[in-house]
């Protein structure tokens, strides 16, 4: 699980990002140059499309700190997204999990906490690279308006969550030595806007981005199971699809402490 970022620890997070930036930038470029992967222009929809190929499960889990995970069952990687979170968070989490699937060589085969923590930070940087490229340029070119309204506009255009936008802009502020912007970001970084959908509406923005989708969908996994049965009819561990899915759901609820 990714660390909770606050105004108090944002500088240490930026320091970690700087240490891994070149590696993550190379990984981002490698993916973006692959025509077999970059099939659609919409980055959020592309992320979901990629995960569907791995048997994506989408389901609402009432835990705001649990955005998603990768489960390994019978040697197969299965991504899960929490649809009880706003769509913007789901899109960011999707790219986070794609990093783990494609580039993470640590988290699935050993449990060295320091290495896993670094991989989580790399996954966050990768997601930001895929969704928030040039957000700083867009931000500084916006006309004069309330500071938070500018952040909401960035969220809408880049389809990214509130704190991810702030973190990218804070990195820009530090690089450009813009102390005024850095200070302003810290002042509002920890503010939680319960009325964010209403604020989006007032700005003429689509508020569905900041609302949960509550999608329940395991069809990608079911199709993957079906293909496995056709390809390997001699194997029997996929025979009972319902039991297979139920076991995964049980693990999810155990991890989120919502079930036994």
How would you name each of these model-derived features?
Residues 1-260:
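Active-site hotspot residues in diverse enzymes, especially metal/ion-binding acidic/histidine motifs
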């Amino acid at each position: 699980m990714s660390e909770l970022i606050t105004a108090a620890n944002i500088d240490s997070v930026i320091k970690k990002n700087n240490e891994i930036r070149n590696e993550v930038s190379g990984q981002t470029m490698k993916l973006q140059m692959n025509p077999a992967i970059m099939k659609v222009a919409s980055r959020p929809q592309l992320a979901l499309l990629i995960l569907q190929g791995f048997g994506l499960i989408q389901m609402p889990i009432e835990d705001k700190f649990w955005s998603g995970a990768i489960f390994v069952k019978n040697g197969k990687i299965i991504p899960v997204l929490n649809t009880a979170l706003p769509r913007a968070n789901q899109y960011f989490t999707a790219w986070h999990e794609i990093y783990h699937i494609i580039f993470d060589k640590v988290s699935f085969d050993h449990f060295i906490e320091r290495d896993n923590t670094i991989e989580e930070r790399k996954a966050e940087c990768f997601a930001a690279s895929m969704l928030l490229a040039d957000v700083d340029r867009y931000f500084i070119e916006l006309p004069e308006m309330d500071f938070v309204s500018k952040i909401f506009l960035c969220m809408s255009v880049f389809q990214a969550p509130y704190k991810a936008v702030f973190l990218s802009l804070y990195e820009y502020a530090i690089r450009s030595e813009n102390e005024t912007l850095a200070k302003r970001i810290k002042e509002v970084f920890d503010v939680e806007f319960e009325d964010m959908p209403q604020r989006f509406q007032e700005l003429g923005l689509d508020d569905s981005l900041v609302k949960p989708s509550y999608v329940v969908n395991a069809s990608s996994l079911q199709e993957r199971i079906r293909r496995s049965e056709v390809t390997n009819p001699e194997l029997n561990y996929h025979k009972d699809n319902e039991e297979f899915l139920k076991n995964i759901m049980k693990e999810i609820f155990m991890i989120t402490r919502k079930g036994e």
